[in-house]
Amino acid sequence: MVLVACSQQTAGAPAGPDTDKIVLTGDQKADWAQIIALENQAKALVDPSGCSSAFDCRTAPVGSRACGGPRYYLIYCARTTDSVALFRKLNAVAAAEREFNSKYQLVSTCEFRMPPKLGLSGASCQATTPGQ
């Protein structure tokens, strides 16, 4: 048996993943500004505070360098951040940046960037070592 369900977005319903899709215009500066705006929306979802243990601290990769891998990592508290919404937004940022890098034939360094080690300061997640 196969179950199939369809849904129709109604006014006031949460935005779906397609609402984060960026259409590159051919203007490199304007296209990068779109990616940064989407990245800023992702950053607005992050809350590094409200954790009672360092085990609740997480990192999330941001962007996509031309040679692969993220540009950097965001630090957040899993208890106070909607990680599903965050990663939906960050996946859109990475996809847009991959397309941007390809369209404009950008290159980057190819070193592997490790996420930072995390710790708790008060009730706020912080890097204890810098990410590379």
Positions of predicted regions on the chain:
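Sec-dependent bacterial lipoprotein signal peptides
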Residues: 1-4
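Bacterial signal peptide processing site
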Residues: 6-9
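N-terminal low-complexity, Pro/Thr/Ser-rich intrinsically disordered segments
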Residues: 14-41
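Extracytoplasmic/periplasm-facing segments of secreted or lipoprotein envelope proteins
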Residues: 31-67
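Extracellular disulfide-bonded cysteine-rich modules/repeats
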Residues: 58, 114-121
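Mature extracytoplasmic domains of secretory-pathway proteins
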Residues: 59-96
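Functional cores of ribonucleases/endoribonucleases
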Residues: 84-117
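Short, low-complexity, Pro/Ser/Thr/Gly-rich segments in the mature regions of secreted, periplasmic
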Residues: 121-132
